[in-house]
């Protein structure tokens, strides 16, 4: 099985006290089976830009620009035609009760297009037909 990591999973790895269950799960899965979306990088960058402490901000920028590319390498997935079409389909069938953000539906579409299991803390954010979801925090 291959996995698409949500932003909250990637961000957990840089926290001062990361969740032990997430750490254990990540250590048990070969890194070649872990993928992220370009949108995850964008969400992380957006969060970093809001930080006012320049030392922390610079530390996180270094992590984003150097460590994450080393960790994921070629496993950073772009938005291609198949993902875009699946996203269009998903947004057309999901009702107002789902309240999924554009980024969450793009991540779901990416996971479906690449046959990946979505890994997130926010299971309810990925209530999408056909999408397998895993919460390593539990």
Give residue spans per PLM region:
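Acidic, PIN/NYN-like endoribonuclease modules and their adjacent C-terminal/linker elements
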Residues: 1, 108-138
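Short secondary-structure boundary/capping segments
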Residues: 1, 25-28, 67-68, 76, ...
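Generic structural signal for small/hydrophobic residues in well-ordered secondary structure
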Residues: 6-7, 22, 44, 87, ...
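Histidine- and aromatic-rich ligand-binding microenvironments
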Residues: 5-6, 37, 99-101, 122
